[in-house]
């Protein structure tokens, strides 16, 4: 699976902005440790379409909008918001779906404070390949992981390997900034 420079740039922007539609969802829902109610799940499932809507007038991100909208479509058609099936889902959205799911499984979340190991998360991706995830994308992701674990480099010969650096999502950046910008209950509010 070879992607060009333009596709990689689109994927990078979509990766940063894919959860932008969560911006209006209350923290009590976003950070809820228990299972979401039906109403809360419906609200959460609207975030891809809301993200696309927020960016509708940003012409520079026209190519990324479908990736943001479709990053929760399941390969078998049971995802959201449009219930697309297989190849109907843009390839870059299928890649984003795998990356987003892997990150979610390997990070601490309110509903899962103990994250899965990368190996356990990859097993989940494999288990749901052909159901939730594009099997070819999962396979390519596995090859990338295996190559990195073995120390193989896909960089130019003679160049030092560039380490993979996790890039925070827009939501993570906004949350971090909000924590630092808002007064806490122990700090007096500025007049």
Please give the residue ranges for each predicted region.
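Metal-dependent catalytic cores of enzymes that make or break cyclic nucleotides
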Residues: 1-191
